[in-house]
């Protein structure tokens, strides 16, 4: 009922309404399989709350009358890999050389840290036109890959850092980008474009406070 109430109001965008919280769709993440407050925003505040009345934060945008640009289509041939101590680069190389993926998401440590042993695999991927996106395994925070030499080398090899996007958003956005183009520069441009509040490339987290 609350979701229907919110949907009738003069607010734009995809939202998730759960347990009285109004969450930006592109920032939503399921936190628990059983709690009533099972969903929460990642790197972002609530868009609003449903109480006796409905209260929106300043970040909730009003509707507009511009025509909807509907651009369907998603590329499902991507691989998602979580790095861990001992994860062999050969696993990445094998998938790259099979030629059955067009994009890769690497869940790295901390602020997007990887080991030097993965650089050759990354270069092989980008040389073959495979988009490589690096994100953090942490639930909150952002990638800051320029902090260390190995991160800078990865960026120079064509890695696309995810900044503060959620994992769900990274995968969906990459699938959408790959359906639009095979040009790695264009894919990076799409990934770093803020369409619905899903990314902040300036490093300012928690931009929408209630």
Task: Describe the predicted segments one by one.
Residues 1, 32-34, 149-153:
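Short, hinge-like loop/turn segments at secondary-structure boundaries
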Residues 1-20, 24-28, 160-161, 183, ...:
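Short, glycine-/small-residue-rich phosphate/pyrophosphate-handling segment
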Residues 6-7, 95, 125:
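Hydrophobic helix-cap positions at the C-terminus of alpha-helices
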Residues 9, 42, 87, 91, ...:
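Conserved active-site and cofactor/substrate-binding residues in soluble primary-metabolism enzymes
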Residues 9-13, 18-19, 75-78, 100-102, ...:
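Short coil/turn connectors at secondary-structure junctions
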Residues 15-19, 82, 107, 135-136:
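Short beta-strand segments
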Residues 24-112, 193-210:
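Accessory alpha-helical/coil subdomains and C-terminal extensions
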Residues 111-210:
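C-terminal non-catalytic interaction/assembly regions of soluble proteins
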């Amino acid at each position: 009922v609350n979701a229907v109430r919110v949907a009738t109001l003069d607010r734009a965008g995809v939202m998730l309404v759960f347990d009285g919280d109004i969450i930006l769709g592109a920032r939503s993440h399921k936190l628990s399989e059983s709690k009533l407050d099972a969903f929460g925003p990642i790197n972002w505040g609530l868009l609003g709350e449903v109480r006796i009345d409905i209260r929106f934060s300043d970040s909730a945008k009003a509707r507009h009358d511009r025509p909807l640009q509907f651009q369907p289509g998603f590329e499902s041939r991507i691989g998602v890999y979580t790095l861990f101590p001992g994860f062999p680069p050969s696993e990445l190389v094998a998938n790259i050389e099979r030629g059955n993926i067009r994009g890769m998401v690497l869940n790295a440590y901390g602020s997007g840290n990887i080991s030097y042993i993965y650089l050759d695999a990354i270069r092989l991927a980008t040389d073959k036109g495979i988009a490589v996106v690096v994100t953090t395994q942490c639930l909150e925070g952002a990638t800051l890959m320029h902090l260390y030499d190995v991160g800078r080398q990865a960026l120079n090899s064509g890695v696309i850092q995810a900044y503060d996007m959620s994992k769900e958003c990274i995968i969906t956005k990459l699938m959408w980008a790959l359906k639009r183009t095979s040009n790695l520069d264009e894919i990076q441009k799409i990934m770093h474009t803020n369409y619905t509040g899903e990314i902040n490339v300036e490093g300012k987290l928690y931009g929408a406070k209630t």
